[in-house]
Curated annotation (Swiss-Prot):
This is UPF0235 protein GbCGDNIH1_0277. It comes from Granulibacter bethesdensis (strain ATCC BAA-1260 / CGDNIH1). Pfam families: DUF167 (PF02594). It comes from the Bacteria. InterPro entries: DUF167, YggU-like_sf. Belongs to the UPF0235 family. SMART domains: DUF167 (SM01152). Disulfide bonds: none annotated.
Length: 107
């Protein structure tokens, strides 16, 4: 089962967010609360008033090389498991996500 899925004009991406992390970065897959694989993303921002969500969006935008305005949170506003939509070429985005899932980056 993949952590991403092609949709019209983009992809959806399943995430597992770790707020207030000591080591920030993204990469690798971990099981979510539902047992399905998700891309792990660790941010230093707290899960308070959307700060972690904003940090996640900024980190994803940089890693996927898209403007942050092209990333939309679909599910998980207050949860660690999130589903986001990323607008862009599904093939290019999917390839980048696969690279992140297999290795990842640390900031």
């Amino acid at each position: 089962m993949s952590i991403w899925r092609s949709v019209e004009n983009g992809i959806t991406l399943a995430l597992r967010v770790v707020p207030k992390a000591r080591k920030i970065g993204l990469g690798g897959t971990v099981p979510g609360a539902d047992g399905k694989p998700r891309l792990k993303i660790s941010v230093s921002a707290p899960a308070d008033k959307g700060q972690a969500n904003e940090a996640v969006r900024d980190m994803l935008a940089k890693a996927l090389r898209v403007p942050a305005s092209r990333i939309t949170l679909l599910q998980g506003l207050t949860a660690r498991d999130k589903l986001v939509r990323v607008e862009g070429d599904p093939e290019t985005l999917g390839s980048t996500v696969e690279t992140l899932a297999s290795g990842g980056t640390d900031s």
